Amino acid sequence: MKFINSRFELKYLLTHKQYYNFKSALLLYTKKDKFTFNSPNGKYFVKSLYYDNHNFLCFNNKLEGEQSRVKVRIRCYEKNKNDNKFVSIELKRRFGDLIKKDSSRVSLNDYEFYLNNGYWKYYNSVINEFIRINAKYCFSPITT
């Protein structure tokens, strides 16, 4: 499954009171996603593995407010590794105020195959771009 989304992100500094008022107002216009809906407390677990190079290009571009930047990450939604049936490959690119996010769900087994063998069993446009960006910037999974 492939998901593509373009949006504008504007960020504002809010007081606690403004935040809670805004959050309450938004509830009238939003629906819970399947993860929140199935969760007993209305919250769910998200684990992200970011890709960057050894100079921390992505991290530094974010800190410096670079207007054109890219973020590559792998996400899963279960605390225990063996409970994850899939992971989400996410490519997030910023062009000024415009944010473009491409995402593709792949099985955990297929992602582990890629990690162990250096290539994918199959390809789609998100996987192709994931490979291209990682090669261009020498990205690899980064933990700190």
Positions of predicted regions on the chain:
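Phosphate-end processing signature that detects enzymes handling 5′-triphosphorylated RNA
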Residues: M1-T144
